[in-house]
Amino acid sequence: LGADKKPRGPSLSPTPIGGDRVGLTLPEAQVALIRAATASGKPVLVAIVAGSAVLVEEWRGDVNAILMSFYAGMEGGTALAEVLFGDVCPSGKLPFTVARDAAHYPFFDRDAEEITYDLWHGYTKLEREGIAPRYAFGHGLSYATFAYSALNARVAGEAIEVSVAVRNTGDVAADEVVQCYIGAPGVEAERAVKQLRGFARVSLAPGETAIARFTVAHDTMRWRAGREWRLEPGTYRVYAGGSSAACLQTSVEV
């Protein structure tokens, strides 16, 4: 879904400004195509070809699967077939948040000549406001399942060292992208609930366990106070898991 013979895709305005999309949903014609396909009674998978978030609330409950392929290049069709037929186990993770409603994102005016945004966007905005996304930052499905355990964190010099165990509890070999997030105390200044500070890909056979390790430098946790970058003392929250919404949590004093 997403392209015709014209240089611009049908998801763009007839007179696009800088390539901005009119909205975050699929074009009406493509939603109609999904409706027609699901009416056949056969299993339907929707492969989204796009470079940013696409809202799926209107039709997600009617299809069997959704795959975000981004712009996969000339071998994208081959890659898609290999995933769908089980030759390759999917292991990708979303680099953005897919919201349930466009209003959950920062305000956007495609005709504005200038605009000022604050610090809150994506998963940091939704977590700050207590809004559940449709698909969280870092989300991604697999033909395997994974279990996390033994999250540990300690201060080592000018860094926090983090380790977490991840086990393949499924029946197929698969990769998992383990993500590490840090949440600052937020007493001296308002901070995000948590922010990504590292990720690591691990390859696991069925039943195999691996330890993912991260070293998070104190410099990456500083905030700007006037003309200096400060490290706020206090209790830092440490998270590790398969997405920003599915994490184990511990804490460490810095």
Model-predicted segments: where are they?
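C-terminal non-catalytic regions of proteins with extracellular/luminal or membrane-system context
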Residues: 1-254
